[in-house]
A protein has these predicted regions:
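Contiguous hydrophobic segments
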Residues: 29-32, 78-92, 133-144
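Hydrophobic membrane-insertion alpha-helices, especially the h-region
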Residues: 8-24
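Amphipathic alpha-helical segments and their boundaries
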Residues: 23-40
């Protein structure tokens, strides 16, 4: 009986150690995944900046450039929603993405302002998100 008890305690200790190791590995992997999401978010913000510059400096085919801008902004939006503890920033990015899709005529007139906002966000400045909310508030949401 004593042997069974000792072996049960040893097995319990080994199981507890294994559980702690797996929990540690899970936490470490979660941090790595979040770092990957953040780096992809930054990379896609860079693509949006390039698309904005391309649109603003172009003379031809602006429709194709705008579609590319919307596509890259959708990627930024997707990665923003994967990042933990990023709620207010997610709202700002989502609203910009929605405005680009729903109000293209209005947003085309505000792309220089949007470029400054994206630049501030890329540089980790909170004023970028604040200005994004101001930009969205300035839109006529009943119009096109």
């Amino acid at each position: 009986m004593k042997r069974r008890m000792v072996s049960a305690i040893i097995i319990s200790i080994i199981t507890l150690i294994a559980l702690l190791v797996f929990i540690g590995l899970y936490v470490d992997e979660s941090k790595r995944v979040q770092e990957t999401y953040r780096s992809q978010y930054k990379i896609n913000l860079g693509h949006v900046r390039e698309d904005l510059d391309s649109y603003l400096n172009s003379e031809g085919d602006r429709d194709m450039r705008y579609v590319r801008l919307v596509s890259d902004m959708s990627s930024v939006n997707s990665f923003a929603f994967l990042i933990n503890d990023f709620t207010e920033e997610q709202k700002a990015i989502n609203q910009i993405n929605t405005a680009l899709i729903k109000y293209p005529d209005q947003m085309r007139t505000k792309l220089e302002e949007l470029r400054d906002i994206v630049e501030d966000i890329s540089n980790d400045l909170d004023k970028g998100y604040d200005n994004a909310f101001k930009l969205i508030e300035s839109l006529n949401k009943k119009g096109t």
